[in-house]
Amino acid sequence: MDNMDNLEPWYRLGFITPHQFVDNVPYQFYRLAPPGMMLVTANLDLADYTEEAVDHELPLLWRHAATLMKRGVDRIVIGGVPVGAALGRERVQAILAEGEKRTGIPFSTDMENIISALNYLGVTKLAIGSRWHEGLNDAVAAYLKLGGVEVIGRKTSGRSLAENETLKTSDGMRLAVDLGRSALEAAPDAEALLLPGGLWVTIHAIPLLEAEFGKPVLINLSATIWATLHAAGLGKPVQGWGRLLAS
């Protein structure tokens, strides 16, 4: 087959998602990632945005990590901002160290990738557009502060996990733009915007709001793809999806 080399993946990213179903993550991943980068998913079944719910899933997480290792992935990311926020940064970093010890593969999370990306961009003041309740938003802000980023403004819709799982795609897409715009308008000193969460389609908001406000806009996947490529020393800028991936 003449084009076999062009079709063979040059990087396999293992991704452990918090949810039983995976739709919006791969749908958006293959629009943001450079051609030839493969997403290899394994699913948890997170019942709620709490530490107890995350603890319940840890045995399955380790089984998935072993499976992803056998599949030959180059890196494993534990997806889901609520996972990191619920556990706190100290526990997350201990889990990442344990994962690397068990598998010999680099481990990261969406939250750690977001912090790495914001630090790279020089962002210390952040606005957030979120669908989550205030307790979770507070936990996200506390986690980011440990990484040198202060959340100075946020707009939220206060939805539960069950509500977010059933949110229509079109409604979620409109909500992402509305919340992001409102967050930046309410916090003019913010240096960037974060639209966290994997249960909604948000990639369209990146170029739209960056053009409108002249500030970087990040989502889970843009930060994770960027951090993965940079950690591997792979300079593969992606155009059209915001400042971060273009860098």
Give the residues covered by each predicted segment.
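A short, acidic, amphipathic alpha-helical segment used as a generic capping/interface helix at domain edges
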Residues: L60-A66, R174-A186, E191, G198-H204
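Hydrophobic structural segments
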Residues: Y11, M37, R102-V123, L179, ...
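Conserved beta-alpha
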Residues: E98-A162, L245-A246
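Periplasmic-binding protein-like
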Residues: I16, D74-G79, A127-S130, A190-G197
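Short, flexible loop segments at boundaries between secondary-structure elements
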Residues: R159-N164, F213, V217-P237
